[in-house]
């Protein structure tokens, strides 16, 4: 996207979607109408399957406007264009049903699915053939030539494909002023693929998966030996297949000497245990025992502070164990690592550098939104909340207890409590009136850094909750802070 015309203003757009005002129209333009000028390569002959990215990064409540994007009307060269929500994805070859079932529960498959659900609402793709030889390439569309002066028309010399977007009445000029639009934009994840080759003996089949500082193991991508034999985490028969494969298992720690990483993890477990069980001592009537319990709480607070200050940036190592090998040889393991919370809050506009040679121009690689969503591995207490949600709800949110358990699973120790109320609001869809809502009030123990983090938390939680809930559940999420 090179240029955009919105609310009587002509903007120049760079590769980070930042807009620079070029000129103001001399006459009024149609309301709720945006023109997008595309610089299209000569080798591209059709706009079919081109995905457009739309965002309102400066609006705190942008979800209701993203929800209405499928209601927009698109056209090029005076001809309407049929659009569908979501980014274009190539269709994959069908897999054998058993393997496809287990792959759907793979860690990376689950993460990729969640990321796509978060960003699909930003994308609209062209779902019909739009031959470019039927669309005139011009510096300004004919409908706008009379709106700008001769000076502006002389500056606009590049031949562009102009796409017209008409928004619903819910979009005011102030809202459209915050619109960012672009193409050639894709969701990215903070992960790095490692490849490690190890020589193994038949009697010792343990492979340490190395990670660097601030890195954590995310998932194992593939395991193969020198004979070309593949290894999987689960053993399942494939009907009609003669392929031979083995199995492996992943273990965290237990194969190395006791070091500072083990000490920090063990102290964290001890603190969780003390926090959970200290209240039992207060129920005893003995004054001496209660005084000792008070001293123990003070020592626990000091111990927690000392644990937080331990400068250990490496996690407890993981080990891949081959269950059975036919003979000794080399095993090649590919696995993903991530930087967890360290990769959060990288601001929009930051230039990116590719790790390897790509077919893309490195000068055009940049973030168009702030990164968020990275989490550390759950602590022991948070694991209990995750197990509780999985056992009670089975991945579906139907009751208020399910909503509270889901929020606790997502936010962990940051969430003090969840208050859920029934409410009513005016639907953003023009044909609907008042709709019932579920108002989720999140009471946090620690204040977030700013409105942008609150917006990211609301959008992420809203998307994840909606994906697990019935279509009749309309959520409104509010963030409050514990004053106690």
Which ranges hold each PLM region?
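Intrinsically disordered, low-complexity, polar/charged repeat-rich segments
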Residues: 1-484
């Amino acid at each position: 996207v090179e240029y955009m015309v919105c609310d009587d203003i002509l903007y120049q757009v760079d590769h980070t979607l930042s807009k620079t005002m070029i000129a103001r129209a001399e006459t009024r333009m149609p309301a709720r109408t945006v023109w997008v000028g595309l610089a299209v390569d000569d080798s591209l002959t059709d706009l079919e399957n081109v995905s457009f990215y739309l965002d309102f990064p400066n609006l705190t409540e942008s979800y209701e406007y993203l929800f209405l994007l499928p209601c927009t009307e698109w056209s090029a060269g005076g001809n309407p264009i049929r659009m569908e929500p979501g980014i274009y994805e190539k269709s994959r070859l069908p897999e054998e049903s058993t393997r496809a079932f287990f792959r759907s529960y793979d860690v990376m498959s689950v993460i990729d699915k969640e990321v796509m659900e978060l960003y699909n609402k930003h994308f609209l793709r062209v779902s019909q053939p739009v031959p470019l030889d039927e669309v005139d390439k011009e510096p300004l569309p004919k409908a706008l030539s009379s709106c700008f002066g001769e000076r502006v028309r002389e500056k606009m010399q590049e031949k562009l494909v102009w796409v017209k977007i008409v928004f619903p009445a819910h979009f005011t000029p102030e809202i459209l002023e915050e619109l960012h639009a672009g193409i050639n934009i894709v969701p990215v994840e903070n992960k790095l693929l490692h490849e490690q080759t190890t020589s193994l003996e038949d009697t010792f089949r343990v492979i340490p998966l190395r990670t660097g500082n601030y890195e954590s193991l995310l998932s194992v991508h593939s395991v193969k030996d020198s004979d070309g034999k593949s290894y999987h985490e689960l053993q399942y028969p494939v009907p009609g297949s003669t392929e031979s494969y083995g199995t492996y298992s992943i273990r965290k720690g237990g194969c190395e000497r006791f070091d500072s990483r083990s000490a920090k993890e063990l102290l964290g477990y001890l603190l969780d245990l003390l926090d959970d069980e200290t209240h039992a001592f207060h129920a005893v009537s003995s004054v001496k025992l209660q005084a000792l319990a008070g001293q123990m709480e003070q020592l626990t607070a000091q111990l927690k502070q000392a644990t937080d200050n331990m400068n250990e940036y490496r996690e407890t190592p993981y080990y891949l164990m081959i269950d059975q090998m036919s003979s000794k040889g080399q095993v090649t393991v590919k696995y993903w690592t991530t930087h967890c919370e360290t990769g959060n809050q990288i601001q929009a506009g930051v230039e990116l550098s590719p790790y390897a040679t790509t077919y893309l121009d490195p000068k055009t690689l940049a973030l168009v939104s702030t990164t968020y969503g990275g989490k550390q591995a759950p602590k022991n207490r948070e694991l209990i909340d995750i197990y509780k949600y999985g056992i009670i709800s089975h991945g579906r949110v139907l009751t208020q207890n399910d909503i509270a358990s889901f929020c606790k699973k997502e936010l962990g120790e940051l969430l003090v409590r969840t208050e859920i109320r029934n409410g009513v609001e005016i639907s953003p869809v023009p044909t609907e009136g008042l709709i019932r809502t579920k108002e989720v009030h999140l009471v946090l123990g620690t204040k977030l850094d700013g409105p942008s983090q609150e917006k990211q938390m609301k959008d992420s939680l809203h998307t994840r909750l909606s994906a697990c809930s019935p279509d009749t559940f309309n959520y409104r999420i509010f963030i409050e802070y514990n004053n106690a």
